[in-house]
């Protein structure tokens, strides 16, 4: 049965109208050797055969214990969360088109905004962005629009920003006249040296970007950088891991006046690892900047009969006003992921989040301490971290990671591709899912691998 709706006479009429002799002629700009004449699809199979086939394919997966981190984190997600998310009311109506007709969906987003504003200490939150990297790019654009006192479209960025975030930021802003200056990393402690900021004191910046914990896992000197930025007329954009905020002070408490905009990757709070996505970005801000905030914002209101309800508010988006005037051209938010995050935070509560964050830090501390006891292995930076730490090895780190895979362990993130000075370094991450037995197995596997490859 053909699922192409056009009849042969309809196709002929369309081809005659545009002056083409055949459908193939429409694609003649594609070289012949790149075209697929046949799809080589086998005959259909029944459900039992399909289940057996997929089971065989699933058995090819390697179920390694994961210590990678670097922006995407393995956390336990209670079964109830995605069981609730998969309900039809959420699963098929996750994005608020004809929004007011879906009061339940709007309330979930409103609760999410409330929780994220509380977690970050900000006044307002939007309904989410695509991911952490695009949330940062939108935050930079927002800061430039909002900082009316700035005489330039320059942004100052600490070198320890996640490299993928930086690439996405450069891509999105490439043709918008925005320039970036980078503050070099202090190689001794893995973070920005506040005293180096004075080298940039004579340049006018619209915003300063601070990531903490930074890409190398270190906690930045957020107070010093925030105060410096505000002293020089720049807005502060905080990039952070939401899970870390359960035990660290919120960006609203950075420096004397706090950050102005907060963004980051929401994956750690209820979203599983899935080959890079879908995840979701979050963004919160002070009320002074809310009219420049992109994406959807849900507000609480009352209808004509005085009944409380929810609606989309401050809709300066491209669907409602001229594209050139819009604060955002995002076509949908990650509503389903937001639903998962909202349920995750609701079920765990403040104490549960704090417990997960604390155990993650403690397990990382234990792993790093035990690794440092191995001959030739050391902790690279002597400064505070959350749940990631850089480890120096006596061998090439990429080789070490490859060999550890044979021990059913994803040992960490190879940092050589990030910085040439870190060719013998990996970044390891532990969370609440790692048991003491897991950590012991990692240590023993490390000793075994180092002995095998000559460490």
Curated annotation (Swiss-Prot):
HAMAP family: GcvPA. The gene is gcvPA. It catalyses: N(6)-[(R)-lipoyl]-L-lysyl-[glycine-cleavage complex H protein] + glycine + H(+) = N(6)-[(R)-S(8)-aminomethyldihydrolipoyl]-L-lysyl-[glycine-cleavage complex H protein] + CO2. The glycine cleavage system catalyzes the degradation of glycine. The P protein binds the alpha-amino group of glycine through its pyridoxal phosphate cofactor; CO(2) is released and the remaining methylamine moiety is then transferred to the lipoamide cofactor of the H protein. GO terms for molecular function: glycine dehydrogenase (decarboxylating) activity. InterPro entries: GcvPA, GDC-P_N, GDC_P, PyrdxlP-dep_Trfase, PyrdxlP-dep_Trfase_major, PyrdxlP-dep_Trfase_small. It is an enzyme of class 1 (oxidoreductase). This is Probable glycine dehydrogenase (decarboxylating) subunit 1. CDD domains: GDC-P. Its EC number is 1.4.4.2. SUPFAM superfamilies: PLP-dependent transferases. PANTHER family: GLYCINE CLEAVAGE SYSTEM P-PROTEIN, GLYCINE DEHYDROGENASE (DECARBOXYLATING). Keywords: Oxidoreductase.
